[in-house]
Amino acid sequence: MGYIHDQDGILKRYFREAVGWEQHLRNSSEFILKCLKNKNVKELIILGSGWLLDFPLEKLSGEIEHIKLVDIFHPVQIQKKVKNYPGVECISADITGGNIEMFYNQVQICKKLNIPFTFPDHTRSPEGIFPENSFVISLNILNQLDILVIDYLKRKIPLGENTIRQIRERLQKDHMELLKTVPYILITDYEELLINRDGWPDTIKNLLYADFLESNYTKDWSWHFDAHGLYN
């Protein structure tokens, strides 16, 4: 579905937008450290670990016995890097909880039978996905879950706006249901503010299709994502 290309794009954007990204990455790492302070975490699971730009691996690897970095694909550089950290491992897995395979199979069925795409039934329970006594971090991934799935579906089948919204809702709500089963930290974009060429706020776009879970500690910050105006 284009995962490797997408991760390469993230790193290229980071190098291009380093000034605007650094504060966001620092905020993410500091938020994680504050939330984990004085918690006796034995196993930490990171969903959407990617390039580890926003995760304080060096510090936490010395404090937590087991750290599992979970993503659909791990860059070779990251696979080599974690070999220097005992107790840290890369796990390749579908962080949507099986939805990627489900949508892929549904497309194949519709093409084989030459029938319109129908929204697949979903019966998978979130219980038992994570090991007992694990602590989970959803790391800047919630509003990204649908991007590659929808891009793939658009290349294969006609896709209406209502179906796109349904997919986004399902992926985000399923993700939140997964988090309900364990202690967790959620870091996510929830709103996109577009700035016009004169430097004034132009459009606000909601990025979430699922309700936040109750939390004891929250923090908001702005991420200057695209100062060069190349994002679309």
Kindly give the residue locations of the regions a language model identified.
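Class I SAM-dependent methyltransferase Rossmann-like catalytic core
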Residues: M1-V41
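Charged, low-complexity C-terminal accessory regions
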Residues: Y190-N232
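S-adenosyl-L-methionine
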Residues: K83-F130
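Conserved SAM-binding motif I beta-strand of class I
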Residues: H66-D71, S92
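Conserved SAM-binding loop of SAM-dependent methyltransferases across substrates and taxa
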Residues: G50-I64
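Conserved class I S-adenosyl-L-methionine
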Residues: N40-L52
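A short SAM/SAH-binding and catalytic strip from SAM-dependent methyltransferases
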Residues: I115-E127, P131-K154
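Conserved beta-strand signature within the Rossmann-like core of class I S-adenosyl-L-methionine
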Residues: I137-S138, G160-Q172, L178, V182-D189
